[in-house]
Amino acid sequence: MSFSRSEAAPAAPLPDLAATLAAPRDDAFQQLGAAFVTRLPAAPLPAPYVVGFSDDAARMLGLEPALRDAPGFAELFCGNPTRDWPQASLPYASVYSGHQFGVWAGQLGDGRALTIGELAHDGRRYELQLKGAGRTPYSRMGDGRAVLRSSIREFLCSEAMHHLGIPTTRALAVIGSDQPVVREEIETSAVVTRVAQSFVRFGHFEHFFANDRPEQLRALADHVIERFYPACRDADDPYLALLAEATRRTAELVAQWQAVGFCHGVMNTDNMSILGLTIDYGPFGFIDAFDAKHVCNHSDTQGRYAYRMQPRIAHWNCFCLAQALLPLIGLHRDAPSEDARAERAVEDAHAVLGRFPEQFGPALERAMRAKLGLALEREGDAALANQLLEIMDASHADFTLTFRHLARVSKHDARGDAPVRDLFIDRDAFDRWANLYRARLSEEARDDASRAAAMNRVNPKYVLRNHLAETAIRRAKEKDFSEVERLAAVLRRPFDEQPEHDAYAALPPDWASTLEVSCSS
């Protein structure tokens, strides 16, 4: 969602914004009660300063971008004023549970994130959450802080994914501090202001199911349906309809990830959004040299969350959500006994989950057909796309550049093949595939120019490659935030040529292969 400056609401002065956030709130989630949230102020962050800011996210909230320069902005969005807020308006951390790397992990929760309030604009309400705001009752052994490195990565990827058209949480700002924190080495603290209509996760439902709290489970489901899935209210079984919609959104989200070569890295059930958003940017990565078995998370030694595994894991996670919702499914129908209701609930849930492949597969096929510039639907299109991925995998061809350069291929001859062909080690394999591709293009009415234009609207030239983020991070550690701003600006126009920024679209340098990202953020 976006709108022009002229359409935006007048900017609220910072004191008014702070007062709005500090006022007693009516946001529905925190009204669910003490079983769901714990209120506490953020831990003070000394001498905060602005590292990054999203004008676009600000406008989405009805705020003017000039807000970033207002005195006290950094203080407000690292949570420092919250210690002076009334108890009824304090930020809150929510509790949830979940499966981590396929194993039940029990109670988890917002271990370093606090929701400070809601803002309403253009008919929608958005929660504002500070990630890195200090310890909470759910921090376990953590210090409650986020580091500058991971905060910049989350900010940049939130911007990148939104402008790629992929559902995601947003990031309004990154606030830094010189406060040291210990990870694998000494780093500095930062806070990301995350924005979403809701941060409810699969793990919230799992928590109340696992702890046998049916009233809270039903209250949570009713909250999600009432606020985000109102069409489910009128279904024969609202809770089954909720499962169906969440499953569909998840299938379609992961299809979009696969289409741009995005790896999430930590697809635990507590990192799955009930709204089908990309959430919790940690050890993520966009694939450079294509490898279907690519694992972006250095901590994922078993490859559970590899690129090729993401659809299967998403489906598995939906099973976990279904299990948590089973006590609710069928409550609106008359059943001769609780056992009969429960048995029918399992059957109905399995039927919903069985549709996941039917939702994911066509969504990915549509995306791949568009990436190949195919306006017409033909039976062999999926096979053609899969054959391309296979030869890309064999040659470790660059994922993003392969699809971007395919727009130069002509339906008439091989004169435009060189840019993409040069990305392949096995060029004979590419030539064989290109001949099949040209034969398929001959069935299309569009000329090369119009097809190329359409392809360039779906195949990004610019993605957040790890080495680009690393360069911005290294400069930010020296208090030079210009590269964060510059890179964010490039990523906000991923499909545009931007010839002055061609270097951001180039193949990664050799040193990029040594970069590792892990869960230590």
Curated annotation (Swiss-Prot):
Catalysed reactions, semicolon-separated: L-seryl-[protein] + ATP = 3-O-(5'-adenylyl)-L-seryl-[protein] + diphosphate; L-threonyl-[protein] + ATP = 3-O-(5'-adenylyl)-L-threonyl-[protein] + diphosphate; L-tyrosyl-[protein] + ATP = O-(5'-adenylyl)-L-tyrosyl-[protein] + diphosphate; L-histidyl-[protein] + UTP = N(tele)-(5'-uridylyl)-L-histidyl-[protein] + diphosphate
Enzyme Commission number(s): 2.7.7.-, 2.7.7.108
GO MF term (any one): AMPylase activity
UniProt KW Cytoplasm keyword: no
Keywords: ATP-binding, Magnesium, Manganese, Metal-binding, Nucleotide-binding, Nucleotidyltransferase, Transferase
Pfam family, one: SelO
Binding annotation for ATP: 109, 111-112, 131, 143-144, 194, 201, 280
Keyword Transit peptide attributed: no
Active site residues of this protein: 270
Bilayer-crossing regions: none
Needed co-factor(s): Mg(2+); Mn(2+)
Positions annotated to bind Mg(2+): 271, 280
InterPro entries the UniProt entry points to: SelO
Function: Nucleotidyltransferase involved in the post-translational modification of proteins. It can catalyze the addition of adenosine monophosphate (AMP) or uridine monophosphate (UMP) to a protein, resulting in modifications known as AMPylation and UMPylation.
Family: Belongs to the SELO family.
Record-given protein name: Protein nucleotidyltransferase YdiU
